[in-house]
Structures are given as structure tokens and as C-alpha cells.
């Protein structure tokens, strides 16, 4: 569960590395796997200007989709899945990823929440 001021690791190649949640979109007080949040980029990859590889810079505000959480999530078969960190993927207003690659694993719940583009870009879904 990600709330206000939660720190997220950005796992795409948009140029951001850390982001802070400033709003949960349409999900109540907390966001879980597959929910949309508004984030501000706290740390970005080094670069003097915004290039093709670095699409975002520090201080930019973007929408993001939660792809991993530390908090356990119950699956329909009764198992619980949890990850070591909280992670997100930056998206535009149409929920399409800003980056062209996803650098780490994502949760399988993204497929059920209609984020199949993010799930297909990931090297592995768990």
C-alpha cells in the first residue's frame, strides 16, 4: 500500500530513478498493485538536458502505475506475494509507459488490471 509521501523506485528507462507519491488517483487513501498515482521525480539519471534516453528530470510531475509493493497482496488461490521494494513505471495521461524498456520484474496483477503493455515490456512477471 502506497500512501502520500511514499518513496518509489522507478524501473523503466525514462530517466528517473526515485519518485515520491503526491496523490492517489481513483483508489481511495492508499494505492496497491496496478493503481495509478501522481508522483514527483526526486532523483533522475545524470544528464545536462532532457535527451531521448532521459525523458524526465528532477522535479517533474508525472503519473505512474504501481508495479511492486512491500505490502503483501493476496492472490485468488490464497497465496500472498510481496516484494523487497516499492516500484513504479512512469506513464502518460493515456496510461502508456514513457520508457521503452522495463528493467526489472513486475507483479502478475497488472494483467488483470488492464496494464498489459507494461506486463509485456517486463522481462518477467511474478
UniProtKB/Swiss-Prot annotation:
It is found in: Mitochondrion. Its main location: mitochondrion. Keywords: Mitochondrion, Ribonucleoprotein, Ribosomal protein. Pfam families: Ribosomal_L14. GO terms for biological process: mitochondrial translation. Component of the mitochondrial large ribosomal subunit (mt-LSU). Mature yeast 74S mitochondrial ribosomes consist of a small (37S) and a large (54S) subunit. The 37S small subunit contains a 15S ribosomal RNA (15S mt-rRNA) and at least 32 different proteins. The 54S large subunit contains a 21S rRNA (21S mt-rRNA) and at least 45 different proteins. Component of the mitochondrial ribosome (mitoribosome), a dedicated translation machinery responsible for the synthesis of mitochondrial genome-encoded proteins, including at least some of the essential transmembrane subunits of the mitochondrial respiratory chain. The mitoribosomes are attached to the mitochondrial inner membrane and translation products are cotranslationally integrated into the membrane. This is Large ribosomal subunit protein uL14m.
